[in-house]
Amino acid sequence: KRKEAFKVGILTQQASDYVPAKIRFQNNTIKAKMRLKGDWLDHLIGEKWSFRIHLKGENTLFGMKKFSIQHPKTRGFHGEILFFETLKKFNVLTPRYIFVNVDLNGEDLGIMALEESFTKLLLENNKQREGIILKFDESLYWESQINGKKGEFMPAFDNYKTQRIDIFNIKKTYNSPIMSKQLAFATGLLRGFQNKRFSPSHVFDSKTMGSFLAVCEFCGSWHAIRWHNLRFYFNPFTQKLEPIAFDASIYDRNNIIDGHGLLTNLKQEIMVDILKDPQIYKEYRTALLKLKKMIEKEEFIEYLMSIEKKYLTMLGMEFFLLWGYDLEELPVRIDKLLEYSRKDILRIGEKFRPGNQIKEDFPAIIHSTITGSGPDKILEFVNLVPFPIEIQSIQLIDKTNNKTIQPFKPLRSLSYPLYLEATELSGLPSKLSIRYALPVKHDEYRLLAKSSLIGNTKIYENVPSQYIPIFENTPYPILKIEQLLKQFPFLKLSPDHRELILKK
């Protein structure tokens, strides 16, 4: 797998990549499975390869059941800790991140960074109830890097609006009726944001999202806000999505020389769309002002310096030339950030647009999904590329012998080829919806759609899969928590807005 990664320039993963393993710690042996992890080759260089590890049974290690180990430099050594400690001041969810000494098959690898994965244990460690954790599917984004000319990404697949929604811990979710309902709710909300049906503040928790964006700007982390690095927790109490911090890589942060390192959010399309929301922008601004006050008291910078000193001493035992971060830059950074008004931010954000996309050997050109729980279904096609496409045919295929058993019969007649307009780069996707009724013995078949770029002979085959629909209407009344509390005078909200407390 590692050799394959060096051939194509990135590491691709599959569930079948896991191999059995045993973890020994303090005279205990724990059964596990593990695989290589990471996207870029920096995770595979030298002897300190990155691994994703899942412990079996009820076993945990450092309170975690799923985690990764990697060379500390892939996360900027202790920079991740400085980032997380800052976010904790704003009650933004963070994974555990520690340093451990690792032996692999008897070979001393030295110090490795251990990073918690996205499970209910992460939520419980952040004093949150178990809930759904979502992300955008990034598989086509990485496939486009393999297929792209000169190993470059294809701009067509760097669009969060066309990506499918993915979920962590999928088996456990579908086995739980409560979690399944939460999944439908959370996915419907996030799809509503993707398609601009709902405002960002209706989908995301304004306070935690605004604070997250402010801290990312404060630390200069552009990496944590890339759409494919975003992770969202569906809070079943507030029924909103909250960001989970991940992979800040502040060692690669933009500096503030001539202001070029500021407003990293506005170089990410999704963050421009989120910051346009007045409620989230208000919380973003409030968090920046809080950071300024924290810095003016000097205790916060001293706190970060004490953390840095502790970890530089530890890491310096192996990495002798490791330097600290320029924490004195932070006061200058926060002052410059506060100089920008909301109008300035929106104006600057409009300047960042993707480059051109030429016709290439795309990894895919459409997404096709099936929604609906009854006998009547909706087959939806989404154009992923900035070129018009034709759907040549839709067929019912026998699952056992892959032969066509009967023609696809929509509720309204179709005339092939079906036309699907181009999707503008970073724009809302071009779609086509077809209603149809399930045929007799529908469990014995699968749908197969064949499509092509107009003027191109290459045929792309696509098997539609079941998906959760976008909410057509708001799933709950848009009321502020203060308005709701007026209906229940015996309750009050905790200062951190995370608990309801009975008044005495």
Predicted regions and their residues:
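Phosphate/dinucleotide-binding and metal-coordinating scaffold of catalytic cores
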Residues: K1-K504
